[in-house]
Amino acid sequence: MSTLVPYVIEQTGNGERSYDIFSRLLKDRIIFVDGEINDMSADLVVAQLLFLEAQNPDKDISLYINSPGGSVTAGLAIYDTMQHIRPDVQTICLGQCASMGAVLLAGGAKNKRYALPSSRVMIHQPWGGVQGQAVDINIQAKEIVRLKKLTIKYFAENTGKTEKQVAADMERDFFMSAEEALTYGIIDTVMNRRKDG
């Protein structure tokens, strides 16, 4: 089944121009992280972040996230790029930010991390399945532990919690409402609904 992407039409000095909705939003410096985070989706997000930095390194970028998480290494590629580029990256949770999605949400610029009122956030330790010879399993287990320590470190840095507290909270799936994510320090503001007029 193919994914339908809406198109918008704008009037320009040279007539009409049509854009897929995501390209049109990119013109307004809005990027979406939607669905599972994998190498392909991470490459697209990183490319958009770098493009917008090259276009204007002093103007904020908005990263809207609705993700159940996914590949830790792919998510960390996005996270590291967010930290590396000059523009502030404001993060907005809509729907859910789970696992690596929560790491990205917390990694937004300070005082520019948001969640919509009905959204949820979930943190947990990285997981992975391994198979093979004992020595290979040991190598992969060490890497999973390294990635766990790294995500704990990033959550601690971005929330103000201690690494010990974050590690304890990540032992199992730890779900939070938008208000609870605010109290935890993952976001800075629960967004109110826009008023008419």
UniProtKB/Swiss-Prot annotation:
Family to which the UniProt record says this protein belongs: Belongs to the peptidase S14 family.
UniProt-annotated catalytic positions: 99, 124
Function in brief: Cleaves peptides in various proteins in a process that requires ATP hydrolysis. Has a chymotrypsin-like activity. Plays a major role in the degradation of misfolded proteins.
Pfam families: CLP_protease
Record-level GO cellular component terms: cytoplasm; endopeptidase Clp complex
Cited InterPro entries: ClpP, ClpP/crotonase-like_dom_sf, ClpP/TepA, ClpP_His_AS
Subcellular localization(s) per the UniProt record: Cytoplasm
Designated name of the protein: ATP-dependent Clp protease proteolytic subunit 1
GO molecular function: ATP-dependent peptidase activity; ATPase binding; serine-type endopeptidase activity
Record gene name: clpP1
Description of how the protein assembles with itself and partners: Fourteen ClpP subunits assemble into 2 heptameric rings which stack back to back to give a disk-like structure with a central cavity, resembling the structure of eukaryotic proteasomes.
Keywords: Cytoplasm, Hydrolase, Protease, Serine protease
